[in-house]
Amino acid sequence: MFDVIVVGGGPTGLMLASELRLHGVDVVVLEKSAKPTEQSRGQGLHARSVEVMDQRGLLDRFLAVNEKFQVGGLFGGIMKAWPDRLDTAHPYGVATPQPVTERLLNERAVELRAEVRRGCEVVGLSQTEDGAGDGAGAGAKDGAGVTVELADGTRLRSRYLVGCDGGRSTVRKLLGVDFPGQPATVETLLGEMEVTEDPATIASVVDEVRKTQLRFGVAPSENGLYRVVVPADGVSEDRATEPTLDDFKQQLRAHAGTDFGVHSPRWLSRFGDASRQAERYRVGRVLLAGDAAHIHPPTGGQGLNLGVQDAFNLGWKLAAAVDGWAPDGLLDTYHAERHPVGARVVENTRAQITLLGTDPGATALRELFSKLMDFEEVNRYVTGMITAVDVRYDFGEGHELLGLRMRDVELKQSRLYELMHEGRGLLLDQTGRLSVAGWADRIDHVVDVSEELDVPAVLLRPDGHVAWVGEDQQDLLSQLPKWFGSPHHEAAV
């Protein structure tokens, strides 16, 4: 019996597996596909995901094989300079094709001894919810747990299961979770292929077409290939069916008057502008993350990042439930915190689709919005939203930092994010007078100072969000159990 089964071996599932393994959780990843994807749908990490990778010591791996990019206000096809005073020590993204992201995250998961099984299709799921609370012993009583059936008849059991299996999630469907939203109204073809046309001619034609159609692009990718994006002719009845090269040629000619001599495709796909969100991210011992929990148009490049950040929020909480120290309701905070974030992405991508329209009203709106984004405050708001560095969870009233993720700061002895590689809670204490005795197995107490930090002490959750700010020991003790459970019974508090 596994502690956790993760269904889906994309970026979300692999990130979650790594987070669980940091805490010693016995996890297996079940991926339907027999081999890793070649499709570069997700094209980069935004600033918050860059922070996530830095917090786990992975950023250097991404920077070694990818380039930074710095575009602020990437909204509805409108690009502006990076805004001043955005609250991050990483004011950039990393241009990472999805196959590279998956490879690096898979390497990380395997290094941490997560088991990744490919060619494993889940076709059935059942759960027993006896003793399904978040606290000590959850999953250990009365045979409580989750059973999955694979297409080959194999059955596997675990204490918890997380569906990270994409927008057409089998796990979500087997759970019967409603997935309300808007169906696709437009469709776009996307693929990588070779071309025979001269690069300068391609660039000139693309520039002309994009004056009126922003859902169009033919640009160099890798290995001599070109990434082709072109509006489809209507919305297909079955988006799971791959388009053909002839479909691409037809639509390229329709929009550009030429097909650029496209040939020898590496992969071809289609996507629509449908937007939906699961009503619940948790049903008993089963949870949903990534595209299994929310789908939306890819405008702004937020999808892969949203899934990675779902996993970052969930991993430590699920590990706490498995380890038996999770306070009551901790797993429910996953839905409470991440559902509003997903809803905001669904909303802003719908707005971006409107801005990408070709009718006169959309063009006028885009011109107006572009002028508004020249204002620093507007650009900072939009960039903070797209990059997710402005996400604040509702922890109630308190200090202005409460619920925000803490940006990296320089300390006298190190950097803040360097202290977070093990995925534990962190008390950064500039007073030297505080104590987390009783929680030392869950929280690192660091006495250090930073010229960038004007608060006496700050308590960070394993995902880097601020759980407490202050200097009073009794006040700290009143907040520790909320996120880190009861103190170890042998410790003096």
What is the role of each PLM region?
Residues 114-115, 120, 286, 425, ...:
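Short, conserved active-site loop motifs that form the nucleotide-linked donor/cofactor pocket
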